Every structure is written in structure tokens, then in C-alpha cells.
Design a protein with these regions (language model features):
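Post-cleavage N-terminal segment of exported redox proteins
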Residues: 1-49
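Juxtamembrane interface at the cytosolic side of transmembrane helices
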Residues: 1-6, 241-255
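Soluble extramembrane regions of membrane proteins in the secretory/endomembrane system
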Residues: 32-229
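Hydrophobic core of alpha-helical transmembrane segments in multi-pass integral membrane proteins
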Residues: 16-20, 239-246
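Generic amphipathic alpha-helical segments used as scaffolds and interaction surfaces in large
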Residues: 4-7, 228-233
């Protein structure tokens, strides 16, 4: 035991330091967590769905395997896409078409470069400015509601048994009726929308979204913040340096 004492001391020190940092950052993450609005409402005050619906949808999604079958918030998955990124791209694509037809009478991809830039800027402003009001609700425009509903139908059918999506389910290694109950699928889609909302809405007092512009979405000019990139690079460097130090100490100790 005595010959390994210094190694045990090192292990204990690493655990104490590591869990102390983890606890501190975990507390900070808890306080900085994106809000779950009490409800999403239309401009005329109609309640579209509530916080309870979102939380029920989260539980419904987790019951299918959670992050084992697709992921949320850009975590990345071995099986199926990241649903936040997928939803965001699909919804923004629909939104751009709606706004283009309103302004110019044609779809977004039929516009010229200058017109596309103008439409994109309008959509970006709406998404970034979709803030929580003092009463805890978020107001959605008729166009955003239409885009949300169109996107939601795809996910409800994907997790159901729509034969048109059988091949897609095969590609994602999903079975028919992955989530059998219709209401569970509807609320799950609402949960996915909420993750998309936090990924595309500007955090008050900052120049980035609640998720630091992640997942990346070119249609909204969303790119990871410099801080996110810097910390990612630093963490990899620290990991490699740590491994190098351990190997060096082990080799030096044996000599």
C-alpha cells in the first residue's frame, strides 16, 4: 500500500478538484438555465400550449430512449438526428417561404439575393426577439405558428406510423409507432419546439441565444460564439496536456 500512497493522494486530489469544479459549474448552469414559459400564446391571447404540455412532452420523448434515439440541443447522436437542429432548420425554412410569399408572392428560393437577405433579416429579428413577457408567456406571430404547426406534423407522423415516413424511420433505426399515443407525440413536438425556441431566442443582456447560438443554423446566421469555440479548444488542449503529463510521470517514475 505504501508504494502506491502517492498515487492515491493524486487520485483523491484530482477527484476533489474535479468535483469541486463540476459542482460550481453545475450551480452556475442551474441559475443560467433557459426558462420554460408558462405558455405560448397567439397575438390575440389564445393559449397554444403550456409549460405542463412541454414537460409532459419531455417525459414522453425520454420514454422512447431519450438521447439514445436522436438528441436535443445539438448534442449529436449515433442514431437519428439532433431533433433541435432538425426542427429549427425545417421550421425556419417554412418561415422563410411564408414571409417571402407575403412580401413578394413567391417562395424564398425563387427570390434574388437582395430580396432573400431582406426576408432573412425579418425572420432573424422575429426569432431572436421572441422573448418571455413579464407574465411568463411568449407571443408567437401567425406566421411562426403556421411554421411551427407544419414542422410539428412531421414529428408527430415520424414517431407514429405514417407510411410515407417508413423509409425515414428505417434510416433512423426507429420502429413504427415509436410513441404510440397521439397526445404524447403532440406534446413531444411541443417539447422539441421549446428546445428550438431557446436555441434561437436571444438571452437578455447578451448577443447570443440561450444556447450560445447552438445548434448551428445558417438560415439564421447562427454560428457558435467565440467563447464557445475558445472553451472547446482549451478543453481539448487541457485533456491532451493532462494525458501527456500522466504518461511522462509514469515513464519517469518507472525509471
Amino acid at each position: 500500500m505504501g508504494e502506491y500512497k502517492k498515487y492515491w493522494i493524486a487520485v483523491v486530489a484530482v477527484l476533489i478538484i474535479g468535483f469541486s469544479i463540476l459542482g460550481y459549474l453545475g450551480t452556475d448552469v442551474y441559475h443560467q438555465a433557459p426558462p420554460v414559459p408558462t405558455a405560448y400564446v397567439s397575438q390575440d391571447g389564445q393559449v397554444l400550449f403550456t409549460k405542463e404540455d412541454i414537460l409532459h412532452g419531455q417525459s414522453a420523448w425520454q420514454s422512447t430512449g431519450g438521447q439514445s434515439v436522436g438528441t436535443v440541443l445539438g448534442h449529436g447522436a449515433y442514431q437519428a438526428p439532433d431533433w433541435t437542429a432538425d426542427w429549427l432548420h425545417k421550421e425556419v425554412s417554412v418561415m422563410l417561404d411564408i414571409k417571402s410569399q407575403e412580401a413578394f408572392g413567391v417562395l424564398y428560393n425563387q427570390l434574388g439575393t437582395a430580396q432573400q437577405a431582406a426576408v432573412k433579416e425579418v425572420v432573424k429579428e422575429e426569432y431572436l426577439g421572441s422573448a418571455v413577457r413579464e407574465d411568463g408567456t411568449v407571443v408567437l406571430s401567425p406566421e411562426r405558428i403556421a411554421a411551427m404547426n407544419a414542422t410539428g406534423r412531421y414529428f408527430v407522423e415520424l414517431y407514429g406510423d405514417n407510411p410515407d415516413l417508413t423509409l425515414t424511420r428505417d434510416h433512423f433505426a426507429m420502429k413504427d409507432n415509436t410513441l404510440p399515443e397521439l397526445q404524447d407525440r403532440i406534446d413531444m413536438a411541443r417539447f422539441f419546439f421549446w428546445t428550438t425556441w431557446m436555441a434561437s431566442t436571444q438571452r437578455p443582456g447578451t448577443d447570443a441565444t440561450y444556447t450560445n447560438n447552438w445548434p448551428h443554423e445558417p438560415l439564421l446566421d447562427h454560428n457558435p460564439t467565440p467563447e464557445s469555440v475558445a472553451w472547446s479548444v482549451v478543453s481539448v488542449i487541457i485533456l491532451l496536456c493532462g494525458i501527456g503529463v500522466v504518461v511522462w510521470l509514469w515513464s519517469f517514475g518507472k525509471k
